[in-house]
């Protein structure tokens, strides 16, 4: 069964609506105090900061984010930031593409911002991107990367954004910055197994429509920055993602699809109709509810379980991309995700999977937050599941952008 849509204006839950002003202010004040207490602890209480970032309302203000985001990414703010070289624009092979993307990013800046200020920020955005790429030649620019960088720039400023983006690019975003889209494609392949765990009916409908997962590509590689119009919702998601496992964005993508289950099932069962519907992401989503449910699914169906299942399926059958001819056809028809089309249909589904997974007793909140944040606390080990999964997965030549 789906995550049923509920009425709401899409704001950040009870922090913005539904409670009296006095109650709201009291909760906010209490949370701010808890965040500062965690920051002032010796050593800093990172587990508490992760809980604050994940829990309802997130980190609340950009001022707090300037203090907490570096801690979540283990960036030492006392160290001098990287210094941009004046000749980078002349030397960088990516400069022209970065320039085009940044020029198209007008809507990512606050409405009403003076042109002069916006243009100055766009220049800073270009400098940050080129500097990170120059310092890390193993990284490759992709269209959509600027949508993530501009979020950090607007929240923490150029100096701190450079350090944060560099750390993020070598960790959470690392798979997106390979020479090809192979690893990105593999991460997208987690989407359908997650959906299948909650709603086999929706999963089978989408498989019959052969819609694939391309509709979620821009969600994943921009952390939803490219598709959400309200900057408050973007930074709220960044609070969540920075405090969690690198695969959490794909879980959030799954709960969006599940939330819209009835809309999808009411569509014509063909690729064009379903792709069009899912590509148009609603702006009034109940973000706090979806964040909580994404966390529930992560705990109930961790990446290691889904990765092994997907890997076994990939070994069991050939895919549309396994030969050049089939790959060419799949790319032309925008149906590249055939890896999980038949997921061991001979195996019996447990009875419980026909029920709504999310009707089970809710996971203890503190246990759930601890599990979601655990891999982040382990630093480089946070990517171990992803890396091991990629070792099992076959490689696909799939170039999605010009």
UniProtKB/Swiss-Prot annotation:
The record marks 143 as: Glutamine finger. It is a multi-pass membrane protein. Residues 59-245 form the Rab-GAP TBC domain. The keyword Transmembrane helix applies. Residues 14-26 have a biased composition (Basic and acidic residues). GO terms for molecular function: GTPase activator activity; small GTPase binding. Residues 1-27 are annotated as: Disordered. Pfam families: RabGAP-TBC (PF00566). Keywords: Disease variant, GTPase activation, Membrane, Transmembrane, Transmembrane helix. One of its GO terms (cellular component) is Golgi membrane. The chain crosses the membrane at residues 237-257, 366-386. SMART domains: TBC (SM00164). The keyword RNA-binding does not apply. The arginine and glutamine fingers are critical for the GTPase-activating mechanism, they pull out Rab's 'switch 2' glutamine and insert in Rab's active site. PANTHER family: TBC1 DOMAIN FAMILY MEMBER 20, TBC1 DOMAIN FAMILY MEMBER 20/GTPASE. This is TBC1 domain family member 20. It comes from Mus musculus (Mouse). The gene is Tbc1d20.
């Amino acid at each position: 069964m789906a995550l049923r849509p509920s009425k709401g204006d899409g704001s950040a839950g009870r922090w913005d609506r539904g409670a009296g002003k006095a109650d709201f202010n009291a909760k906010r004040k209490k949370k701010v105090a808890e965040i500062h207490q965690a920051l002032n602890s010796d050593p800093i209480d990172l587990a508490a900061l992760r809980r604050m970032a994940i829990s309802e309302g997130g980190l609340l203000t950009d001022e707090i984010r300037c203090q907490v985001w570096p801690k979540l990414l283990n960036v030492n703010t006392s160290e001098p930031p990287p210094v941009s070289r004046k000749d980078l624009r002349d030397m960088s092979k990516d400069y022209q593409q970065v320039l085009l993307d940044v020029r198209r990013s007008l809507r990512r800046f606050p409405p009403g911002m003076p042109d002069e200020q916006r243009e100055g920020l766009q220049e800073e955005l270009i400098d940050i991107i080129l500097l990170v790429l120059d310092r890390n030649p193993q990284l490759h620019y992709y269209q959509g990367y600027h949508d993530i960088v501009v979020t950090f720039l607007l929240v923490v400023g150029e100096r701190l954004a450079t350090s944060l983006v560099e750390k993020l690019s070598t960790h959470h975003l690392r798979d997106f910055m390979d020479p090809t889209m192979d690893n990105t494609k593999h991460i997208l392949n987690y989407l359908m197994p997650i959906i299948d765990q909650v709603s086999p009916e929706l999963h089978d409908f989408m498989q019959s429509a052969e819609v694939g997962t391309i509709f979620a590509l821009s969600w994943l590689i921009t952390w939803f920055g490219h598709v959400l119009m309200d900057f408050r919702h973007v930074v709220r998601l960044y609070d969540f993602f920075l405090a969690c496992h690198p695969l959490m964005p794909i879980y959030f993508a799954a709960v969006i699809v599940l939330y819209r289950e009835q809309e999808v099932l009411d569509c014509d069962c063909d690729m064009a109709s379903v792709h069009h519907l899912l590509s148009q992401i609603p702006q009034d989503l109940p973000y706090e509810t979806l964040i909580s449910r994404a966390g529930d699914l992560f705990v109930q169906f961790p990446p290691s379980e889904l990765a092994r299942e997907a890997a076994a399926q990939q070994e069991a059958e050939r895919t549309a991309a396994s030969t050049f001819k089939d790959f060419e056809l799949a790319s032309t028809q925008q149906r590249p995700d055939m890896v999980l089309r038949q997921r061991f249909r001979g195996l019996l589904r447990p009875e419980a999977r026909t029920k709504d997974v999310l009707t089970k007793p809710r996971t203890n909140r503190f246990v759930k937050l601890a599990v979601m944040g655990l891999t982040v606390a382990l630093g480089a080990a946070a990517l171990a599941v992803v890396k091991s999964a990629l070792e099992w997965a076959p490689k696909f030549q799939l170039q999605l952008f010009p």
